[in-house]
Amino acid sequence: MALKHFNPVTPSLRGTVLIDRKELWKGKPVKGLTEGKNKSGGRNNHGRTTSRFIGGGHKQSYRYVDFKRRKFDVVGTVERLEYDPNRTAFIALVKYEDGELAYILAPQRLKAGDQVVAGARVDIKPGNAMPLSAIPVGTIVHNIELKQGAGGKMARSAGTYAQLVGKDSGYAQIKLQSGELRVVRGECMATIGAVSNPDNMNQHMGKAGRSRWLGRRPHNRGVVMNPVDHPHGGGEGRTSGGRHPVTPWGKPTKGYKTRVNKRTDSLIIRRRKTGK
């Protein structure tokens, strides 16, 4: 999909750059593959804010997307590509030979009429899914499982991908876009190709209201708050915060390591680049 640049006929259109979605399905999603969705406003079951600056936005329905791809050796035809408000990538409606319908993450270069299939030995083309052990080294993949049968967890956002760089003693070595190099069991599934909508990062909303439609509220810096609200708050006039950058709860930020999952440390060969 191309980017759509707007002429400044109104102040809010000046500088606005959006994704041109004219090739996507303009109707409603398949009702049997959707479910109602309640907004949390960033609050948990106690009513406390667990994710700040979230709230409002247009009402959405959740689309069931097949991240597992366990329908082996049944060819499916792509009926159409659709917009999904729950993710940055586009989704593809697939109709299998037995009549079943399913949504999958749409990879780049996939279009209506193409055929996709999942299996132990299938063609290396975008949209096909297979175990990492059957994929040639050097292939670009997405929607990668971390645990066999649990469904894809890595490389699912718009434009993302990972590269299979090696295989050794039942494990596959995956290089992520962050620079991290990690190993995954060879039985885990992955889908060929990179995720659709790579221009998502080049969008420019143009006005605050467009972010509010997406459920994003204004993001306030700590230095403009009061001392009761943030460690950087307070002071007469504009201040720099007076201390090293911390979160609202006093923990160091900007490069501070927070990873605590020691159980899977052995599966990470090289940590991601942090810019420090």
Swiss-Prot record:
Domain of life (superkingdom): Bacteria
Bias-annotated ranges (Polar residues): 41-52
GO BP field: cytoplasmic translation
Listed GO CC annotations: large ribosomal subunit
Region (Disordered): 30-52, 224-257
HAMAP family: Ribosomal_uL2_B
Role of this protein: One of the primary rRNA binding proteins. Required for association of the 30S and 50S subunits to form the 70S ribosome, for tRNA binding and peptide bond formation. It has been suggested to have peptidyltransferase activity; this is somewhat controversial. Makes several contacts with the 16S rRNA in the 70S ribosome.
The protein, known as: Large ribosomal subunit protein uL2
Organism: Gluconacetobacter diazotrophicus (strain ATCC 49037 / DSM 5601 / CCUG 37298 / CIP 103539 / LMG 7603 / PAl5)
Origin organism lineage: Bacteria, Pseudomonadati, Pseudomonadota, Alphaproteobacteria, Acetobacterales
